[in-house]
Structure formats: structure tokens, C-alpha cells
A protein has these predicted regions:
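Surface-exposed, interaction-prone regions used to assemble/regulate multi-protein complexes
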Residues: 1-146
Length: 146
């Protein structure tokens, strides 16, 4: 049953969209030779392009500069994520998952997505699966279907 939800299924698929939800979950949408897959991250991540960091988990949150209007601060992520989405779609050519559920996705245009499973063991780090059934849940010390 895990094989239907294995992150290795992303190999050869295209990352087509990245967005955040109101509760700060980042949704990575992949499509390709099979139905669309969704990777939802709740933990730290870093996206680099040709060695330069272009997006991180920290960029999700409102900046702490109190001189900046709140509405502008909340739009900051949309500005930062545009640097990434302007490089899409991009084909995934490498997938690595460590025994602690850190996940690394490498794309053909030198784009690299590193997801760090750094939440406490009782909290989900990331979730993966087909678009209509995102059930594979990764914790720092285990993976299971919900």
C-alpha cells in the first residue's frame, strides 16, 4: 500500500505550482505521467536555484518590522514565491528520503528542494499522495497512512 504513496513517484514528474494555505501549509503540486500529486509541508524547507536560496519556510511568516503595514508583510511570501514559480514547470530528476524523513528533490534546471523533518515526533512534518487522497504522513521518527 505504501508504494502508491511513495515520494519516489515524483521522479520524472513536473513541479507545476507552489502555494501556501491560510494556516501556513505549503502545497507543492506535481503532475506528469500519472495523476497530480500533492506534497504538503508543515516543517522547515529551503529551495535553492543554482546554489542561491530563493525560498525558505521562514519567508512564510509576517515580517517582524513593525513599521511595515501588516497587509504588505502578508504579501511578502507571494513576492518571494514568484521567484520560484517563474522557474516552473520543472521536471524532478532526483528524490532522496532519509531515515528521519528529510526529503530532497532535485530538478533538471539546478532547482533543489530540501525539506527538513524537524518537528516534534508527535507533529506531522509533511504529507504526500495523489491530489484527492493525500494520506502518507511523515513524522521525524515514522511514516504511516492516515
Amino acid at each position: 500500500m505504501f508504494s502508491a504513496y511513495c515520494p519516489d513517484l515524483l521522479l520524472g514528474q513536473c513541479l507545476t505550482d507552489v502555494a501556501r494555505t491560510p494556516d501556513f501549509i505549503v502545497r507543492w503540486t506535481f503532475s506528469g505521467r500519472t495523476s497530480p500529486y500533492i506534497l504538503q509541508t508543515y516543517c522547515g524547507f529551503r529551495v535553492t536555484h543554482e546554489g542561491e536560496t530563493i525560498l525558505t519556510q521562514r519567508m512564510l511568516y509576517t515580517r517582524t518590522d513593525f513599521d511595515e503595514p501588516l497587509t504588505d508583510a502578508n504579501r511578502r511570501f507571494d513576492h518571494d514565491v514568484f521567484r520560484l514559480t517563474s522557474l516552473l514547470p520543472v521536471k524532478i530528476v532526483g528524490v532522496k528520503c532519509s531515515n528521519t524523513n528529510d526529503l530532497i528533490l532535485c530538478a533538471e534546471n539546478h532547482l533543489r528542494i530540501e525539506i527538513f523533518a524537524d518537528a516534534p515526533p508527535v507533529c506531522e512534518d509533511w504529507r504526500f499522495g495523489p491530489q484527492d487522497d493525500v494520506r502518507l504522513c511523515a513524522f521525524t521518527d515514522c511514516v504511516h497512512l492516515k
